[in-house]
Swiss-Prot record:
Phosphoserine: residues carrying this PTM: 9, 389
Keyword terms, alphabetized: ADP-ribosylation, ATP-binding, Biological rhythms, Carbohydrate metabolism, Cell membrane, Cytoplasm, Developmental protein, Differentiation, Glycogen metabolism, Kinase, Lipoprotein, Membrane, Neurogenesis, Nucleotide-binding, Nucleus, Palmitate, Phosphoprotein, Serine/threonine-protein kinase, Signal transduction inhibitor, Transferase, Wnt signaling pathway
Modification comment: Phosphorylated by AKT1 and ILK1. Upon insulin-mediated signaling, the activated PKB/AKT1 and RPS6KA3 protein kinases phosphorylate and deactivate GSK3B, resulting in the dephosphorylation and activation of GYS1. Activated by phosphorylation at Tyr-216. Inactivated by phosphorylation at Ser-9. Phosphorylated in a circadian manner in the hippocampus. Mono-ADP-ribosylation by PARP10 negatively regulates kinase activity.
Further remarks about this protein from its record: Simultaneous silencing of GSK3A and GSK3B by RNAi stimulates replication and promotes survival of INS-1E pancreatic beta cells.
Protein family per UniProt: Belongs to the protein kinase superfamily. CMGC Ser/Thr protein kinase family. GSK-3 subfamily.
Protein name: Glycogen synthase kinase-3 beta
Subunit structure of this chain's protein: Monomer. Interacts with DAB2IP (via C2 domain); the interaction stimulates GSK3B kinase activation. Interacts (via C2 domain) with PPP2CA. Interacts with ARRB2, AXIN1, CABYR, DISC1, MMP2, MUC1, NIN, PRUNE1 and ZBED3. Interacts with AXIN1; the interaction mediates hyperphosphorylation of CTNNB1 leading to its ubiquitination and destruction. Interacts with and phosphorylates SNAI1. Interacts with DNM1L (via a C-terminal domain). Found in a complex composed of MACF1, APC, AXIN1, CTNNB1 and GSK3B. Interacts with SGK3. Interacts with the CLOCK-BMAL1 heterodimer. Interacts with the BMAL1.
Underlying gene: Gsk3b
Lineage: superkingdom: Eukaryota
Spans annotated as Disordered: 1-53, 385-420
Residue stretches of biased makeup (Polar residues): 1-22
Enzyme class: transferase
Record keyword Phosphoprotein present: yes
Length: 420
């Protein structure tokens, strides 16, 4: 979690929020079974701002924290379950999470279906409500289940979950957006299909070179060392460090760097990676001069993990958990790593016998950071399948165009970004 209260994301613009004309209109009625039905005027998450009535029922609290409250509800028109994230809105500012989520459209990112505003109990209190895809599980809960049973998560699931996480990061990083809170709790899972969706963009920000950012960001176990060193000019590579921590945790069955404090977090990292060199410290934060840790040698990666851990998994981990931010793999490079070769096998299936989820429907936007990697990322059987399915290609093209529009909007909003 970030150091600031996450009741709302701070502004990318200091102009007052333009509330919808139907702001605050919330009708409560009963259906034929006597269940409470709430009807609001909501704006679709994507596309033009055309407010419409949305009715939902069966509301119950499924989570809360410093950010606000999350409810589960059922849409009356489709019967689909959704999650409604309710956060206190500072009327002086636009909500950064909302601005970012409206630009995103990817199979591995939780979708913003609608958003609406509602009144609070106090005078002038305004809440923003984000209506999102409901996904029943998280990587955190699934991993905890295996850990409590004294078992390790099957490697095929480690591959599927991490690959989809890297795809989601390749997508948001292509827009210059850094998530800044990658952790197992923010990776939603459908256990039947093995589809993973990245959620919680409450800490996310479009990073602009030369503009400072807060260093007290990201949950402790997953914080990149440059953040611990107080860097304010970090890049999206902090997400890749966090992803490396998630990968290591899935292989180990417990967090790899379980620090009790910021300094202790660094100690845990040094126990594995060894003491960083002066050059590595300079790469993390040129202004940091107070480094006085004892000289400790790096622990061999093969001894960090269990004896039967796949060598490719260890190799991938070592390329993510690097002190030097620029030495870490990019998300696309991670997807192309040999650890994921099994997923590119045309005969691979889920342990329950089902087909694997969509893994190769890359758009131009996703591949923009390194187009030549497409030769590895899209295996021959997927190319043949795509060529035989024009509607799928049309969807991909549509997604790409939507991504291009989002990139333009991002560039426009970046200049108004603040320094949190």
């Amino acid at each position: 979690m970030s150091g600031r209260p996450r009741t709302t994301s701070f502004a990318e613009s200091c102009k007052p929020v333009q509330q919808p004309s139907a702001f605050g209109s919330m009708k409560v009625s009963r259906d034929k079974d006597g269940s409470k039905v709430t009807t609001v005027v909501a704006t679709p998450g994507q596309g033009p701002d055309r407010p419409q009535e949305v009715s939902y029922t069966d509301t119950k609290v499924i989570g809360n924290g410093s950010f606000g409250v999350v409810y589960q509800a059922k849409l009356c028109d489709s019967g689909e379950l959704v999650a409604i994230k309710k956060v206190l809105q500072d009327k002086r500012f636009k909500n950064r999470e909302l601005q970012i989520m409206r630009k995103l459209d990817h199979c591995n990112i939780v979708r913003l279906r609608y958003f609406f505003y509602s009144s609070g109990e106090k005078k002038d209190e305004v809440y923003l409500n984000l209506v999102l895809d409901y996904v029943p599980e998280t990587v955190y809960r699934v991993a905890r289940h295996y850990s409590r049973a004294k078992q390790t998560l099957p490697v095929i699931y480690v591959k599927l979950y991490m690959y989809q996480l890297f795809r989601s990061l390749a997508y948001i990083h292509s827009f210059g957006i850094c998530h800044r809170d990658i952790k197992p709790q923010n990776l939603l899972l459908d256990p039947d299909t093995a589809v993973l969706k990245l959620c919680d963009f409450g800490s996310a920000k479009q990073l602009v070179r030369g503009e400072p950012n807060v260093s007290y960001i990201c949950s402790r176990y997953y914080r990149a060392p440059e953040l611990i060193f107080g860097a304010t000019d970090y890049t999206s590579s902090i997400d890749m460090w966090s992803a490396g921590c998630v990968l290591a945790e899935l292989l180990l069955g417990q967090p790899i760097f379980p620090g009790d404090s910021g300094v202790d977090q660094l100690v845990e990292i040094i126990k594995v990676l060894g003491t960083p060199t002066r050059e590595q410290i300079r790469e993390m934060n040129p202004n940091y001069t107070e480094f006085k840790f004892p000289q400790i040698k790096a622990h061999p990666w093969t001894k960090v993990f269990r004896p039967r851990t796949p060598p490719e998994a260890i190799a991938l981990c070592s390329r993510l958990l690097e002190y030097t931010p620029t030495a870490r793999l990019t998300p696309l490079e991670a997807c192309a790593h040999s650890f994921f070769d099994e997923l590119r096998d045309p005969n691979v299936k889920l342990p329950n016998g089902r087909d694997t989820p969509a893994l190769f429907n890359f758009t131009t936007q996703e591949l923009s950071s390194n187009p030549p990697l497409a030769t590895i990322l899209i295996p021959p059987h997927a190319r043949i399948q795509a060529a035989a399915s024009p509607p799928a290609n049309a969807t991909a093209a549509s997604d790409t165009n939507a991504g291009d529009r989002g990139q333009t909007n991002n560039a426009a909003s970046a200049s108004a970004s603040n320094s949190t």
